[in-house]
Amino acid sequence: MPEGPEIRRAADNLEAAIKGKPLTDVWFAFAQLKPYESQLTGQLVTRIETRGKALLTHFSNGLTLYSHNQLYGVWRVIDTGEIPQTTRILRVRLQTADKTILLYSASDIEMLTAEQLTTHPFLQRVGPDVLDARLTPEEVKARLLSPRFRNRQFSGLLLDQAFLAGLGNYLRVEILWQVGLTGQHKAKDLNEAQLNALSHALLDIPRLSYTTRGQADENKHHGALFRFKVFHRDGEVCERCGGIIEKTTLSSRPFYWCPHCQK
């Protein structure tokens, strides 16, 4: 499943295609959304927001389209009039004069008013988004030490969207490698230096992935361009200590780590 950085980049692509342009045609597959087709035609997409792995498409009339891709959903941008070659099932089409965005295969799609946004179950449950520039390491540290999260092992905590939205398995693996910790640790057991390092890494690595992942420069490291240090690198040499990276399973997900330098 895509993680926060990939979802945010997808939102950026959608915004670049249709933001601020009048919608010339709107189509929804689900019957409960059909009444909104006429209400949205002629309106503008004002912004596309991410909350972890959910997308919120905000319209100029105050409505917001909530969508969660889950495992199978995918957005596409096409030229208006183009007929995509795909076997996927179309769920949403938002069309402007020159560009059209399409949502395929997703099933978790709703139209929300401003009031409903504040009471939506997923949006109420999800924690602060790691890509929200307003979120600080100090706030992350406070969440780590809060009664709700301080006794949770990192193996599960770093996959819990209620803790921090936008984290996922590759980020969990890379963050814990960066700070030299295993997934069995809990925040309550860390010293001050470890807490500070983890609080920064929980923001720095997702943000680095968002801004630079996919740019090719294998000589760069965290702090310059993002690339995997341990994820999918089992059997390879750890660049930090020379140990051999191993693969196991934690919280029912593949976990990659270096037993020599992650303690």
UniProtKB/Swiss-Prot annotation:
Against SUPFAM superfamilies, the record matches this protein to: Glucocorticoid receptor-like (DNA-binding domain) (SSF57716), N-terminal domain of MutM-like DNA repair proteins (SSF81624), S13-like H2TH domain (SSF46946)
Catalytic activity reads:
2'-deoxyribonucleotide-(2'-deoxyribose 5'-phosphate)-2'-deoxyribonucleotide-DNA = a 3'-end 2'-deoxyribonucleotide-(2,3-dehydro-2,3-deoxyribose 5'-phosphate)-DNA + a 5'-end 5'-phospho-2'-deoxyribonucleoside-DNA + H(+)
Q: How is the cofactor bound?
A: Binds 1 zinc ion per subunit.
Q: Which UniProt keywords apply?
A: DNA damage, DNA repair, DNA-binding, Glycosidase, Hydrolase, Lyase, Metal-binding, Multifunctional enzyme, Zinc, Zinc-finger
Which InterPro entries would you find in this protein's record?
DNA_glyclase/AP_lyase_DNA-bd, DNA_glyclase_Znf_dom_DNA_BS, EcNei-like_N, Endonuclease-VIII, FPG_cat, MutM-like_N-ter, Ribosomal_uS13-like_H2TH, Znf_DNA_glyclase/AP_lyase
Enzyme Commission number, as recorded: 3.2.2.-, 4.2.99.18
Keyword Metal-binding attached: yes
Q: Which residues bind DNA?
A: 70, 125, 169
Q: Which cofactor does it need?
A: Zn(2+)
What does the record list as GO biological process? Answer: base-excision repair
Start and end residues, zinc fingers (FPG-type): 229-263
Q: Which domain of life is it from?
A: Bacteria
> Which positions are catalytic residues?
2 (schiff-base intermediate with dna), 3 (proton donor), 53 (proton donor), 253 (proton donor)
Fetch the Gene3D superfamilies from UniProt: 1.10.8.50, MutM-like, N-terminal
| Signal peptide region | none
The similarity annotation says: Belongs to the FPG family.
UniProt function note: Involved in base excision repair of DNA damaged by oxidation or by mutagenic agents. Acts as a DNA glycosylase that recognizes and removes damaged bases. Has a preference for oxidized pyrimidines, such as thymine glycol, 5,6-dihydrouracil and 5,6-dihydrothymine. Has AP (apurinic/apyrimidinic) lyase activity and introduces nicks in the DNA strand. Cleaves the DNA backbone by beta-delta elimination to generate a single-strand break at the site of the removed base with both 3'- and 5'-phosphates.
Output this protein's name: Endonuclease 8
Name its species: Salmonella newport (strain SL254)
From which lineage does this chain's organism come?
Bacteria, Pseudomonadati, Pseudomonadota, Gammaproteobacteria, Enterobacterales
